[in-house]
Amino acid sequence: NGGPISNSLLSKLQKDILTGKLKAGQKLTEQELCREYEVSRTPVREAMRKLELEGLVVMIPRRGAQVANITEKDLNDVLEVRIALENLSIENACTRMTEEQLEELWNAAKNFEATMAEGNLVKLAEADVAFHEVIYKSSDNRRLNQVLNNLREQIYRYRVEYLKDEETRNLLVKEHKEIYAAIKN
């Protein structure tokens, strides 16, 4: 299952891919990764195998590993599943959310709106995640949360692109308020 070094390397590589530090299509050589992350070849190989299973890296015969490109179709497929599961999560939250969680949801919606004014898209993406996290937690379904978190990670690197559009940002503020109202009532 990999030692502490390969697990630490794995999470660093995941983060670097998901935040776009390592770009889609970028070649990943063992030597460069060993040097960059100050580890030996074994943890690099283990991390590459796991990243391939997660769909973040593709192995190309006789060329090595590269950061996976995600097509618009991949993205739409993930979004389609996420929307369906998120609706289930919201339905569950309607009957299971506590007053404290409802207040937390309102604060998260307000925080998203406040963060919008700052113009920092990475922070805005995090504020959006925080809003949805409150719903996931209050739906009180561990398996559903795991799947939703996995889907969220798969599209993380596109979220910042998506948030560049002002119309999209305004739509999300409206959507957050509608979700809050639906759960409250």
Where are these regions (language model features)?
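Short linear motifs at protein or domain termini
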Residues: 1-91, 95, 101, 133, ...
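A short, amphipathic alpha-helical segment
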Residues: 14, 181-184
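Conserved amphipathic alpha-helical segments that form helical-bundle/coiled-coil interaction surfaces
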Residues: 78, 82, 95-161, 174-182
